[in-house]
A protein has these predicted regions:
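Carbohydrate transferase catalytic cores enriched for Leloir-type hexosyltransferases
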Residues: 2-177
Length: 177
């Protein structure tokens, strides 16, 4: 990774390289499907764009080959007692300091307190269709956060046609994003 000071501050017009923030917590710990998705996106983006990527972590950044490029700035932030608190309090403040142009959330929910364009990836909405597969608190948290995040996002990446149809059905107000 690279130090934030060596990259020029944003925001800029969309004609030059972007400063892209990423909620990179999915790269920490044991790899998940979303973590592998993010790792592959980072590999492609750092090879095929001139953009700078700021990868935000709750605690130390992992030793991950996808981060081993001068185009990725590792931003380990102090953990919070709960992931939602980290996402809504620690992350937005750090993202503002970094002068980002856009923020990418690879796992269903984005920081609602950010005031820059957000792009949120949604892999499925199983917590709506099969609520019994989730604890009461986790299912409720996911259902509340995904709706708010989709409404706050400038763009939504539905990772399958089925998920796109689910989003259009459950959240018709955001289906054009």
């Amino acid at each position: 990774g690279r130090d934030p000071e060596v990259l020029p501050p944003g925001p800029r017009g969309l004609t030059g390289p972007l400063r892209v923030g990423i909620d990179a917590r999915e790269l920490q710990g044991r790899p998940t499907g979303t973590g592998r998705y993010l790792r592959n996106l980072l590999r492609v983006w750092t090879r095929h764009t001139d953009d700078a990527f700021f990868a935000y972590f709750s605690g130390p950044a992992p030793d991950d080959p996808a981060l081993a490029t001068d185009r990725v700035v590792e931003r380990p932030l102090r953990p919070a007692p709960h992931g939602v608190l980290w996402q809504e309090w620690r992350l937005p403040d750090a993202a503002r300091q970094d002068g980002l142009d856009v923020f990418f959330s690879p796992a269903y929910s984005c920081p609602l307190r950010l005031d820059i364009p957000r792009v949120t990836a949604v892999h499925d909405l199983s917590f709506f269709g099969w609520p019994a597969d989730f604890s009461l608190v986790d299912g409720l948290r996911r259902r509340l956060l995904v709706g708010s995040s989709l409404r706050a996002s400038t763009r939504i990446l539905a990772c399958s046609d089925f998920t796109c149809r689910e989003i259009a059905c459950l959240f018709p107000d955001v289906k054009s994003r």
